[in-house]
């Protein structure tokens, strides 16, 4: 049986929110089988649980935000990407502010935290959402076109293409394909950082956003080049971060996907639209479990490689 996973012991992190600049503490705790991933706003007078699911997404401007009632948690995608990359099904995430800390701008710190806590198997079958027919969302035309698609696939692979007319981006790969079953998430994807332009950062800060952003937690570019002294972590770090984001955005569906995802210029909003489009058509998906590892997609039974 392909089993569900949680962490062995609790672990903690402290950082600042990318947009709020607020200090925030995270406590990641083990959870029982079939709990799913649940954020808990412990800073409120009465703690509020916000479970991860597509309909919990209440805002997709600049990040993926989930909420219940008036309680929200912003910028969940990097932590969700780490959970997906490690195959974690069940987790409580206690948080003391309304935004997940940005840490180094990638998923690497979250992967390290979770692997340090230990990943353990649970006595319950892992439940996948298996895509059974193609689902697509599109927006715009010509140079404004963007789209995202899910198609049937015995496994989970992602292909993303970006289109940035910038010298620093043009000199790197604008498309990448990654198969989560390879077991190479930590090596090939997790370290890819969020990126932005100095002119956009200045405008965002004037609007009260990106207050916690800087060269230590993002790739920052002027009109011509990357400003970070250490350069890029991957030759194609820009598009790999888009894959990282997509893995996190799509994990908000609440279960691991079995599908081939492809996208052109997609972002948080379109990824969530794609999930909602999928769930709205009951003939497009089904719940799948695997009684034997031989039936399961390649690589899904093995633990993800450590650093």
Curated annotation (Swiss-Prot):
<dbReference type="GO" id="GO:0046872">
    <property type="term" value="F:metal ion binding"/>
</dbReference>
<dbReference type="InterPro" id="IPR015870">
    <property type="entry name" value="UDP-acyl_N-AcGlcN_deAcase_N"/>
</dbReference>
<comment type="pathway">
    <text>Glycolipid biosynthesis; lipid IV(A) biosynthesis; lipid IV(A) from (3R)-3-hydroxytetradecanoyl-[acyl-carrier-protein] and UDP-N-acetyl-alpha-D-glucosamine: step 2/6.</text>
</comment>
<dbReference type="Pfam" id="PF03331">
    <property type="entry name" value="LpxC"/>
</dbReference>
<keyword id="KW-0479">Metal-binding</keyword>
<dbReference type="InterPro" id="IPR020568">
    <property type="entry name" value="Ribosomal_Su5_D2-typ_SF"/>
</dbReference>
<feature type="binding site">
    <location>
        <position position="245"/>
    </location>
    <ligand>
        <name>Zn(2+)</name>
    </ligand>
</feature>
<feature type="binding site">
    <location>
        <position position="241"/>
    </location>
    <ligand>
        <name>Zn(2+)</name>
    </ligand>
</feature>
<dbReference type="GO" id="GO:0103117">
    <property type="term" value="F:UDP-3-O-acyl-N-acetylglucosamine deacetylase activity"/>
</dbReference>
<keyword id="KW-0441">Lipid A biosynthesis</keyword>
<comment type="similarity">
    <text>Belongs to the LpxC family.</text>
</comment>
<dbReference type="GO" id="GO:0016020">
    <property type="term" value="C:membrane"/>
</dbReference>
<dbReference type="InterPro" id="IPR011334">
    <property type="entry name" value="UDP-acyl_GlcNac_deAcase_C"/>
</dbReference>
<protein>
    <recommendedName>
        <fullName>UDP-3-O-acyl-N-acetylglucosamine deacetylase</fullName>
        <ecNumber>3.5.1.108</ecNumber>
    </recommendedName>
</protein>
<comment type="function">
    <text>Catalyzes the hydrolysis of UDP-3-O-myristoyl-N-acetylglucosamine to form UDP-3-O-myristoylglucosamine and acetate, the committed step in lipid A biosynthesis.</text>
</comment>
<keyword id="KW-0862">Zinc</keyword>
<keyword id="KW-0444">Lipid biosynthesis</keyword>
<feature type="active site" description="Proton donor">
    <location>
        <position position="268"/>
    </location>
</feature>
<keyword id="KW-0378">Hydrolase</keyword>
<dbReference type="GO" id="GO:0009245">
    <property type="term" value="P:lipid A biosynthetic process"/>
</dbReference>
<keyword id="KW-0443">Lipid metabolism</keyword>
<feature type="binding site">
    <location>
        <position position="78"/>
    </location>
    <ligand>
        <name>Zn(2+)</name>
    </ligand>
</feature>
<dbReference type="InterPro" id="IPR004463">
    <property type="entry name" value="UDP-acyl_GlcNac_deAcase"/>
</dbReference>
């Amino acid at each position: 049986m392909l089993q569900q996973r949680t962490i062995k012991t609790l672990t903690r992190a402290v950082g600042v929110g990318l947009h709020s600049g607020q200090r925030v503490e995270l406590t990641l705790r083990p959870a029982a089988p079939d709990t799913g991933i649940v954020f808990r706003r412990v800073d409120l007078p009465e703690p509020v649980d916000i479970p991860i699911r597509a309909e919990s997404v209440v805002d997709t401007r600049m990040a993926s935000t989930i909420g219940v009632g008036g309680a929200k948690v912003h910028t969940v995608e990097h932590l969700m990407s780490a959970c997906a990359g490690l195959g974690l099904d069940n987790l409580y995430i206690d948080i003391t502010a309304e935004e997940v800390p940005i840490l180094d701008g990638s998923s690497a710190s979250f992967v390290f935290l979770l692997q340090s806590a230990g990943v353990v198997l649970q006595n319950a079958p892992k439940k996948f959402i298996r895509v059974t027919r193609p689902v697509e969302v599109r927006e715009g035309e010509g140079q404004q076109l963007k789209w995202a698609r899910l198609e049937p696939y015995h496994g989970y692979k992602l292909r993303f293409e970006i289109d940035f007319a910038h010298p620093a981006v043009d000199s790197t790969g604008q498309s990448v394909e990654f198969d989560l079953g390879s077991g190479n998430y930590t090596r090939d994807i997790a370290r890819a950082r969020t990126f932005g332009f100095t002119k956009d950062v200045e405008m965002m800060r004037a609007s009260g956003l990106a207050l916690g952003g800087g060269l230590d937690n993002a790739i920052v570019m002027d009109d011509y080049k990357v400003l970070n002294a250490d350069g890029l972590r991957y030759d194609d770090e820009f598009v790999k971060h888009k894959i990282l984001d997509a893995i996190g955005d799509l994990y908000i569906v609440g279960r691991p996907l079995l599908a081939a995802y492809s996208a052109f210029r997609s972002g948080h909003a379109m990824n969530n639209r794609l999930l909602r489009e999928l769930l709205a058509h009951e003939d497009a998906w089904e719940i799948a479990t695997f009684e034997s590892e031989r039936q399961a997609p390649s690589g899904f039974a093995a633990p993800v490689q450590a650093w």
